[in-house]
Amino acid sequence: MEWNTLVLGLLVLSVVASSNNTSTASTPRPSSSTHASTTVKATTVATTSTTTATSTSSTTSAKPGSTTHDPNVMRPHAHNDFYNAHCTSHMYELSLSSFAAWWTMLNALILMGAFCIVLRHCCFQNFTATTTKGY
């Protein structure tokens, strides 16, 4: 019985020693130029009392809230302009130096061309139908 108590006590102490972690969570602020971070330290307190016949071990953990994922998924970028959460549309500068800009322009031209072809077809069909009606 005492061998099991000793193993249980060592197990509790090793868990307590390995669970002293510090986690950091970033909290977003309304201003676009300041960033703040809040540090939350998780502390674990272990109490072990041993008598000759029985042993009682209890572990109390004071954690603010355990989540498995990071709710603050937006991280500051090196060029914190367009992807900033507080960026508005007038802050974005248009340029033709990227592939995405050329691809968007090509798609817009294709759509406008297809629209013109469809309109010409419909209008031409209507025009020929009305002008050849009397013949």
From Swiss-Prot:
Transmembrane feature ranges: 99-119
Region of interest (Disordered), residue spans: 21-73
Residues in compartment: Virion surface: 20-98
Keyword annotations: Disulfide bond, Host Golgi apparatus, Host membrane, Membrane, Signal, Transmembrane, Transmembrane helix, Viral envelope protein, Virion
Biased composition (Low complexity): 21-68
Processing after translation: O-glycosylated.
Intravirion topology ranges: 120-135
Pfam families: Herpes_UL73, UL73_N
Gene that this sequence comes from: gN
Subcellular location: Virion membrane; Host membrane; Host Golgi apparatus, Host trans-Golgi network
Membrane topology per record: Single-pass type I membrane protein
UniProt record similarity statement: Belongs to the herpesviridae glycoprotein N family.
Protein name: Envelope glycoprotein N
Lineage: Viruses, Duplodnaviria, Heunggongvirae, Peploviricota, Herviviricetes
Role description: Envelope glycoprotein necessary for proper maturation of gM and modulation of its membrane fusion activity. Also plays a critical role in virion morphogenesis.
